[in-house]
Amino acid sequence: MRPSNRTPEQNREIKITRHYTDYAEGSVLIEMGNTKVLCNASVSGSVPRFLKGKGKGWVTAEYAMLPRATHIRNMREAAKGKQGGRTLEIQRLIARSLRAAVDLNALGENMITVDCDVIQADGGTRTAAITGGCIALADALNWMVKKGKLKKSPLKQMIAAVSVGIYQGTPVCDLDYAEDSNAETDTNVVMTESGGLIEIQATAEDGAFSHEQLLSMLSLAKGGIEALVVEQKKALNAE
């Protein structure tokens, strides 16, 4: 039995609030159960040096966790003087995932930065950041069209992500902290709306896991992500 009493394939309740802040071109608060992540997408008319003059755009991301997003206060990384390895790994994952959603050639020499700030963490913060960040990215691209910066949105497809794992011997989808902290296997999966795989991060926490268990987790992830894409599109079509 899962601590949340959910079935193995069941996602946590999701809530998506668009236009959450006033200044960002795309702004989304995504809530996956008790995990809450603010995703702001900002448009810039410049690109990294390695892309200048090539007529191609870029999507990047930053990730941070508020000091009291967790049960015990964590020091701000700015106060430590550098970002931690976990933070760098996560924001690179978010950026890679979101770039798969966009035709970078059609974006022109523009850059979109998606800032993902965890307000409250209860497991699955990086996957929530990707799912919410893609909606914020879509809104930012639509803003560019409305402002005449693009003729049409270069968004190719929606991208979403979910965690899966083995908890008490059973593969389960969308782990919260109570499950994640006791899981035998912890896996993050990023997929396109058409089912294409972008990234699989799978780690055994307590001994090895089998090929069959991996396939079972990927099957759960596919179903979970399909449900998330439905919610993404529902949110984008809400106005």
Swiss-Prot record:
Disulfide bonds: none
InterPro entries with a match to the protein in the record: ExoRNase_PH_dom1, ExoRNase_PH_dom2, ExoRNase_PH_dom2_sf, PNPase/RNase_PH_dom_sf, Ribosomal_Su5_D2-typ_SF, RNase_PH, RNase_PH_bac-type, RNase_PH_CS
One GO MF term: 3'-5'-RNA exonuclease activity
Top EC class, one word: transferase
Catalytic activity line of the entry: tRNA(n+1) + phosphate = tRNA(n) + a ribonucleoside 5'-diphosphate
UniProtKB keywords: Nucleotidyltransferase, RNA-binding, rRNA processing, Transferase, tRNA processing, tRNA-binding
Binding site for phosphate: R86, G124, T125, R126
The enzyme's E.C. designation: 2.7.7.56
Coiled-coil features, chain-numbered ranges: none
CDD domains the record matches: RNase_PH_bact (cd11362)
Record GO biological process: rRNA catabolic process; rRNA processing; tRNA processing
PANTHER family recorded: EXOSOME COMPLEX COMPONENT, EXOSOME COMPLEX COMPONENT RRP41
Family of this protein: Belongs to the RNase PH family.
NCBIfam families named in the record: RNasePH
Quaternary structure note: Homohexameric ring arranged as a trimer of dimers.
Stated role: Phosphorolytic 3'-5' exoribonuclease that plays an important role in tRNA 3'-end maturation. Removes nucleotide residues following the 3'-CCA terminus of tRNAs; can also add nucleotides to the ends of RNA molecules by using nucleoside diphosphates as substrates, but this may not be physiologically important. Probably plays a role in initiation of 16S rRNA degradation (leading to ribosome degradation) during starvation.
Protein name: Ribonuclease PH
